[in-house]
Amino acid sequence: MSIRSKFNKDEKKFVKFIDSTEEIIKHLNKSDSSKRSRLKLSGQQIDVLESNFKIDSHPNSATKSLLSNALSIPLKNIQIWFQNRRAKEKTARDGGRRRSGNAEIEDGEYEHGKMSYQAMCPFDFPPQERYFL
């Protein structure tokens, strides 16, 4: 047997030791049937969540708890729904584009921090002769 069990009577703990790579591989290759299934919300549940989101996009814990009980949805799923919905709204507000940290914009400034080229490089371009004397 590749798994040994040890019971320490003093500490009353049960410890398993895995002795082989085979057991580790077997554990990692377990079927996905033990994986929890995704919660599918009904149209009515989504309508209630959306209407509450319009009122308050950051509900307090009491409101989330009430929604959880009223809709028979775990509290954690309510929290995640609001988090995802806020992210969706932010993406829609930003036009769906990703922003890079220092994307150049037309007037020679950088979007992040609004630093001009002149502030980044104090000498003129193209370099003038005075720099090479």
From Swiss-Prot:
SMART domains: HOX. Its main location: nucleus. It holds the Pfam family Homeodomain. It is found in: Nucleus. SUPFAM superfamilies: Homeodomain-like. InterPro entries: HD, Homeobox_CS, Homeobox_domain, Homeodomain-like_sf. GO terms for molecular function: DNA-binding transcription factor activity, RNA polymerase II-specific; transcription cis-regulatory region binding. One of its GO terms (cellular component) is nucleus. Keywords: DNA-binding, Homeobox, Nucleus. Residues 86-109 are annotated as: Disordered. Residues 34-93 bind DNA. This is Homeobox protein HD-5. It comes from Encephalitozoon cuniculi (strain GB-M1). The gene is HD-5.
